Regions:
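Alpha4 helix (beta4-alpha4-beta5 surface) of REC/receiver domains from two-component response regulators
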Residues: 67, 88-106, 114, 118
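Acidic, metal-coordinating helix/loop segments flanking the phosphotransfer/catalytic sites
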Residues: 35-53
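Non-catalytic signal-transmission and effector/linker regions of two-component phosphorelay proteins
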Residues: 1-8, 112-129
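Acidic catalytic/metal-coordinating carboxylates
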Residues: 37-38, 64-68
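Receiver (REC) domain active-site loop signature in two-component systems and cognate sites
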Residues: 60
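Two-component/phosphorelay signaling modules centered on CheY-like receiver
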Residues: 16-34
Length: 129
């Protein structure tokens, strides 16, 4: 069963090692993946209706994941995204002040690659229905 065929994922995380790992793992699973370590580069190359899922680090130097997700959603309002983060609770609580639904969109680091696989498959499968 090749449910990953044709699914496009965008990854934005300032940790290059993690970005490379996620990209290689997801490509091995059959996804088409674009990965960026700079949120501004990701934003400048983003196009509407290209990605089935966007995975964003929550805490990045140039622009946090919430800001980036808002800018991406201005381009593609139906965008499906999740934040992957190891940010501390205080940082997340501060972001939740203006984004009360933030918590339901967070995947916490560290995580196992199988967790990524299961979560992505669930998100994309449920989104197709």
């Amino acid at each position: 069963m090749s449910t990953t065929k044709g699914k496009n994922i965008l990854i934005v995380d300032d940790d290059e090692d993690l970005t490379d790992l996620y990209e290689a793992f997801l490509k091995f699973d059959g996804y088409k993946v674009d990965a960026f370590t700079d949120p501004l580069d990701a934003l400048s190359s983003f196009r509407k209706d290209v990605y089935d899922l966007v995975l964003l680090d929550l805490k990045m130097p140039q622009m946090n994941g919430v800001e980036l997700s808002q800018k991406l959603q201005n381009i593609d309002p139906n965008l499906l995204f999740r934040f992957i983060t190891a940010a501390n609770k205080e940082y997340i609580e501060n972001l939740k002040t203006n984004n009360p639904d933030l918590e339901k969109n967070i995947i916490y680091k560290p995580l196992w690659l199988n967790e990524i696989r299961t979560t992505i498959h669930s998100l994309l499968y449920n989104n197709d229905q």
